[in-house]
Amino acid sequence: MDIIFGRNRKEQLEPVRAKVTGKIPAWLQGTLLRNGPGMHTVGESRYNHWFDGLALLHSFTIRDGEVYYRSKYLRSDTYNTNIEANRIVVSEFGTMAYPDPCKNIFSKAFSYLSHTIPDFTDNCLINIMKCGEDFYATSETNYIRKINPQTLETLEKVDYRKYVAVNLATSHPHYDEAGNVLNMGTSIVEKGKTKYVIFKIPATVPEGKKQGKSPWKHTEVFCSIPSRSLLSPSYYHSFGVTENYVIFLEQPFRLDILKMATAYIRRMSWASCLAFHREEKTYIHIIDQRTRQPVQTKFYTDAMVVFHHVNAYEEDGCIVFDVIAYEDNSLYQLFYLANLNQDFKENSRLTSVPTLRRFAVPLHVDKNAEVGTNLIKVASTTATALKEEDGQVYCQPEFLYEGLELPRVNYAHNGKQYRYVFATGVQWSPIPTKIIKYDILTKSSLKWREDDCWPAEPLFVPAPGAKDEDDGVILSAIVSTDPQKLPFLLILDAKSFTELARASVDVDMHMDLHGLFITDMDWDTKKQAASEEQRDRASDCHGAPLT
């Protein structure tokens, strides 16, 4: 499967015009900006894990029925250092880099010492975050990189630690209606404590504060949750929010800090420091956004691994939240390149299929309720929350759908009651082969699939003046295992799930992870002018397929 995984992708620095078939809605004007691993070998050295690859940004600019594509590697410090050395010298999740073997013993000793408390990579390959008027490539370390979403140029590096004490942070923040960013990170053994930190980055400098300063300087800690283990905090990829609450799952998929601190000496990767403890519980933390305090009742469920929260909302004194959950951590194991490139079908079988699960958590627990009582009275779900003798509440989910990943919703309904989940379809392999629209109300689904095609995360873009939750389009970047089939941007009608258009590009496109759509309303006059220049340049791009 080297045609998809493991092969380095070429940049498309100049915009190329796509061949459009079908009709793109006239109202769809903007840029789909995506991120994912694109380079897996540097010189003679090779990354071990697909999530280690150097970040490759790419974009589809849609304007007046035409589509323009471009891609560029994120010029992170990691990228520049590796390219200059012509080998991998910066460690990643599944690949530990080592000193030049020609160095003397003192240089080697210093390198070991410096890796005891690692300075993580700035290879931000997972997602794109909007903060105020700026856009950032993100991963799960303390570093993010500001980018120019028009040219894909890499700008300054931002270290979260300058503004909030976190060593790790999610690449799936939430945004309120004012554009403020709410995110979570882990503070490892800070002043003798390990904790999960919820923090807010304002979209603009708050009123009354000195203007001209960066909004980052006004980042504030929203709430801190002590880790149940000082040296083994939970790994998490995302979290949930409602209008008034934050939902955090402290799952028994944990990072061993002592192993991480000695990984370099033991010649092991950081990935080896993660372990799933199936005999333990998953603790559900609920934080009130108004008081900034955790709800005191202790909620838990069975051991599981969650990478993606789907959505959450409040209903009849309960919090209802939906997640994609696994019974184990086999997903990460399958993305080792050795599994993806040799005997693919045999080596890429999950031992747990991802399922869409709905949980319900009561905000107020009746102290007089008998032990074993189901505290959930919401008619819309069969999820239960059972009161236990010690006052804890055991939550059991409703299983909604099997075989979903990379979920997205209409973001206007984020934190609110909603009906539709848009996701990729997977089964025993982690590789998506279809796009699915799941209707939570009717428990029905619609699907798009095409032979030899692997779709990326489907992103919903609402139509102007939309009245229904599914009024809009779905955008997904499609790559193919058939070398004769060009990659393309797929545009689906979100309501009927019929294909409206596709924009094929004769480029070396990679399989990406996450991203966002920037509407033309998000561009200022200067950016609009730059877009016109891009169109003029694309028309003269040699070798570009034209409509």
UniProtKB/Swiss-Prot annotation:
EC identifiers of the protein: 1.13.11.63
Primary location group: cytoplasm
UniProt catalytic activity: all-trans-beta-carotene + O2 = 2 all-trans-retinal
MF terms (GO), sorted A to Z: beta-carotene 15,15'-dioxygenase activity; carotenoid dioxygenase activity; metal ion binding
Pathway(s) of this molecule: Cofactor metabolism; retinol metabolism
Keyword NADP: no
Cofactor(s), names only, from the UniProt record: Fe(2+)
Cysteines paired by S-S bonds: none
Region (Disordered): 528-547
Pfam family, one: RPE65
Function in brief: Symmetrically cleaves beta-carotene into two molecules of retinal using a dioxygenase mechanism.
Similarity section: Belongs to the carotenoid oxygenase family.
Protein known as: Beta,beta-carotene 15,15'-dioxygenase
Source species: Homo sapiens
